[in-house]
A protein has these predicted regions:
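Short, structured segments at the rim of ligand-binding sites
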Residues: 1-378
Length: 378
């Protein structure tokens, strides 16, 4: 694949007639779960192939069973061994695929599998999350007919063969990035405007903050560059320590039924500046809530009730510290927020976990008034 960065942070990709899977960067592939999504697209070009084990954030046991069960419906067999997934393909077209769980990557995988299959496939218990919608919008521009985008049932009519079409597409903005900056503003009692927020993936989050007492202004909706996603600009006002803890627990759910699962962690520093005690229930992952307790190192009064629930007492006077990042993106970025809210100089080590999820984060935070220096410690 020819990859070329263009001015304006655009990326041009050109696929060759034949892919060289033996040249795949295995070390890079093992650092992320996105390598799993190669199966749904490569199954149309190869009778057998292998890809490296999927990696990503260390959040406890993360099964690939949903991918395996759904891809089996398309005639795909997956066996694990010697650090790789070994894939075999005997194509068949299912009329209906019921997902074992409503996950983002498994939905994307199955949508791509259906996109080049003959006929129509109905996908039930699909994720309607923002990244799934972007994949669907992209495939629509390539000629794939997809109905039900944003819902839990997708109807995909494949193009039956290779797709050879030049297109330009702009992925929508990331609501999790927006949540990071909003959480930072609240934890540091700052007044900032976060522009181009995908509001459909932030509505309940903003309602929760409203009932905490946060004051904010929101512009009318306008469209993202993809012509589909609704955006707003949100201006966060200083709260001056007047926020109150919610009586009800704060927990995530599968979109569109609740708070986004990757937005939930950013309620930890928000709860820390609220008056009162907050219960956060992170039921999705086996041990992500355990990583939240690292926030005690920067002064947060946090109590681990069990591997999924933490109680946070506030308000908090954050303190400086020298801390190593946990091996999970969102919990690691919480420590950065706490350090920005603390007086004095803190050190956050092994920041690769954060860097792989947020581009030029230190520079952007410095433009808002933070003082962050990235250095190599040999």
């Amino acid at each position: 694949v020819q990859a070329k960065w263009l001015p304006g942070n655009d990326l041009e990709l050109k696929r060759p007639e034949e892919l060289r899977l033996d040249r795949l960067d295995k070390e890079a592939a093992r650092k992320t779960r996105s390598v799993l999504m190669m199966i749904g697209s490569l199954m149309h070009d190869y009778d057998s192939f292998k890809i490296p084990y999927a990696g990503g954030c260390k959040l406890g046991a993360r099964t690939v069973a949903p991918h395996l069960f759904a891809l089996e419906e398309f005639g795909v067999g997956i066996k694990a061994g010697n650090g790789n997934y070994h894939i075999t393909v005997e194509k068949k077209l299912p009329e209906r695929v019921v997902l074992y769980e409503s996950g983002d990557t498994v939905t994307e995988n199955i949508v791509m599998a259906a996109a080049r299959s003959t006929g129509e496939t109905i996908i039930q218990f699909a994720s309607g999350n923002y990244m799934v919608q972007d994949v669907c919008f992209f495939l629509q521009k390539l000629g794939v007919k997809i109905e039900g985008i944003g819902s839990t049932t997708l109807r995909v009519r494949g193009v039956n063969g290779p797709i050879k079409k030049n297109i330009t597409y702009a992925p929508a903005e990331d609501p999790i990035e927006a949540m990071f900056f909003i959480s930072t503003a609240i934890a540091t009692n700052s007044e900032i405007t976060v522009e181009r927020v995908p509001i459909d993936f932030m509505t309940l989050e903003m309602l929760k903050r409203k009932h905490m007492g946060l004051k904010f202004d929101m512009t009318p909706r306008y469209k993202a560059a993809n012509g589909q996603t609704d955006l707003v600009d949100i201006h966060i006002h200083k709260h001056n320590g007047e926020l109150k803890a919610l009586v009800e627990k704060i927990h995530a759910n599968v979109y569109p039924a609740g708070i986004n699962q990757d937005n939930l962690p950013y309620f930890v520093p928000i709860a820390a500046v609220c008056k009162g005690r907050t219960l956060i229930n992170d039921w999705t992952y086996e041990n992500r809530a355990i990583y939240y307790t690292e926030m005690s190192k920067v002064g947060v009064n946090i109590e681990l009730a069990d591997p999924h629930r933490v109680f946070i007492g506030g308000p908090t006077k954050f303190n400086r510290d020298d801390v190593v990042c946990p091996p999970a993106l969102r919990p690691a970025s919480l420590l950065l927020i706490g350090m920005m809210a603390a007086e004095g100089v803190s050190t956050l080590r092994n920041i690769y976990t954060i860097q792989r999820g947020y581009e030029d984060l230190a520079e952007r935070l410095n433009s808002l008034g933070a003082h962050i220096e990235v250095f190599q410690d040999f």
